[in-house]
Amino acid sequence: MTTARKASAVIIAGVVVGLVSGLALGVVWWRLAPRVPLVVQPGASFPQGYQPEGYLAADAAFGALAVIAGVAITIGLANMRREHLFSVLIAALLAGVIGTAAMWWVGTRLGSVDIQGLSATTTTDVVVDAPLKVAMPGMYVMWPIASALVVTILALGDWISEVRSARRGR
């Protein structure tokens, strides 16, 4: 197997694993994240009481799942192709972007309510669970950052190992 073929195999594996794990983690996020009660009135909707901790907890759950996935998947990809960390980095970053998008898409779609439609058709106040959302945009880059950090640590470890073996060889 050629070097380019091995690198492309790691990249394809990263994309596939990122997509599948992102879809699965979207379901996990949907089940773990707390919901904020939303009061829907004719023509308007607003949170029932101000509850920023609900949004913060949903974002924290999203970020924690993303970091765990980034570390685990990057370690798995590095085991596939440890001698060429650049392809591992590309695969891990692609897995992070695709996995984060899939996780967000599934988590926000499951259990969501058409708030505007409900508001237009209701005649009394209705309390529903607000759909999940990521309030802090920084959560979207947690998976790629965790992946890049793992590759950086692996590269640093390889470099330190090479420096030590070069010093012993003198």
Language model feature labels by segment:
Residues 2-14, 50-59, 80-84, 88, ...:
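Membrane-helix interfacial "entry" motifs
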Residues 2-11, 34, 72-92, 108-115, ...:
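Cytoplasmic membrane-interface segments at the C-terminal ends of transmembrane helices
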Residues 11-16, 54-68, 89-94, 126-149:
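Hydrophobic alpha-helical transmembrane segments
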Residues 14-29, 90-108:
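Hydrophobic alpha-helical membrane-insertion segments
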Residues 37-55, 120-124:
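Perimembrane loop-to-helix junctions flanking transmembrane segments
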Residues 99-123:
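Juxtamembrane non-transmembrane "cap" segments at the membrane-aqueous interface
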